[in-house]
């Protein structure tokens, strides 16, 4: 399944979450798009709930179904709770860390920064959004990209940086200083539904 590249606000309204992180998509019309959006009261099956939860998380991180499932399978090989490990692996993606550092306003924009070669890891350019960032690795903006307007605009509006990452706005350098705890990740996601979905 290809990655969705259409209007994110439509997906946000359909899934009931803000993919931009601003919440603006849901302010005026907090219901699914379509003629019957405001009055839809369709009963959802257990399978439907599981699938909806999967779609929420997949769109939140902007992955294709194949990328999402591969990460899920990788999490299943780790010690600990499958669902929590899955959430943590998603959070450790390079494009997500770039987003968390405030270098991009959305994960989609962060993915573009990585794809276009604007980001380095431990001094080496990495253009793979799915690259798994390890604790202590240094994430930086390439010197040639330091004046990138998109990065500057994002830094102007970004204020919240999670405690599990550190960032120096002067040097445009940050790092993952520890593995995030489940309580610090998306509270609106019930990963148990996703584990159940793939266990069917």
Swiss-Prot record:
GO biological process, one term: ribosomal small subunit biogenesis
UniProt-recorded Gene Ontology molecular function terms: rRNA binding; structural constituent of ribosome
Top-rank taxon: Bacteria
Keyword annotations of the record: Ribonucleoprotein, Ribosomal protein, RNA-binding, rRNA-binding
GO cellular component: small ribosomal subunit
Region: Disordered, residue numbers: 22-43
Domain S4 RNA-binding: 92-170
Subunit structure: Part of the 30S ribosomal subunit. Contacts protein S5. The interaction surface between S4 and S5 is involved in control of translational fidelity.
Record HAMAP family: Ribosomal_uS4_B
Similarity field: Belongs to the universal ribosomal protein uS4 family.
Protein's name according to its UniProt entry: Small ribosomal subunit protein uS4
Species annotation: Listeria welshimeri serovar 6b (strain ATCC 35897 / DSM 20650 / CCUG 15529 / CIP 8149 / NCTC 11857 / SLCC 5334 / V8)
Lineage, uppermost ranks: Bacteria, Bacillati, Bacillota, Bacilli, Bacillales
Gene (name only): rpsD
């Amino acid at each position: 399944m290809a990655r969705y590249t259409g209007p994110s606000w439509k997906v946000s309204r359909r899934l009931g979450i803000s993919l931009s992180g601003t919440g603006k998509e849901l302010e005026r019309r907090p219901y699914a798009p379509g003629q019957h959006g405001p009055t839809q009261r369709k009963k959802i099956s257990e399978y439907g709930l599981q699938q909806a939860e999967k779609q929420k998380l997949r769109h939140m991180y902007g992955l294709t179904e194949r990328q999402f499932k591969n990460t899920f399978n990788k999490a299943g090989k780790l010690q600990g709770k499958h669902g929590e490990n899955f959430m943590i692996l998603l959070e450790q993606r390079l494009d997500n860390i770039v987003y968390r550092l405030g270098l991009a306003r959305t994960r989609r924009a962060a993915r573009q920064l990585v794809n276009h070669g604007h980001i380095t890891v431990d001094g080496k350019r990495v253009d793979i959004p799915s690259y798994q960032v390890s604790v202590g690795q240094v994430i930086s903006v390439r010197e040639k990209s330091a004046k990138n307007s998109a990065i500057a605009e994002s830094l102007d509006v970004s204020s919240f940086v999670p405690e599990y990452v550190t960032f120096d706005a002067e040097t445009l350098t940050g790092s993952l200083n520890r593995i995030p705890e489940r309580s610090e990740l998306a509270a609106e996601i019930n990963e148990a539904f996703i584990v159940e979905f793939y266990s069917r």
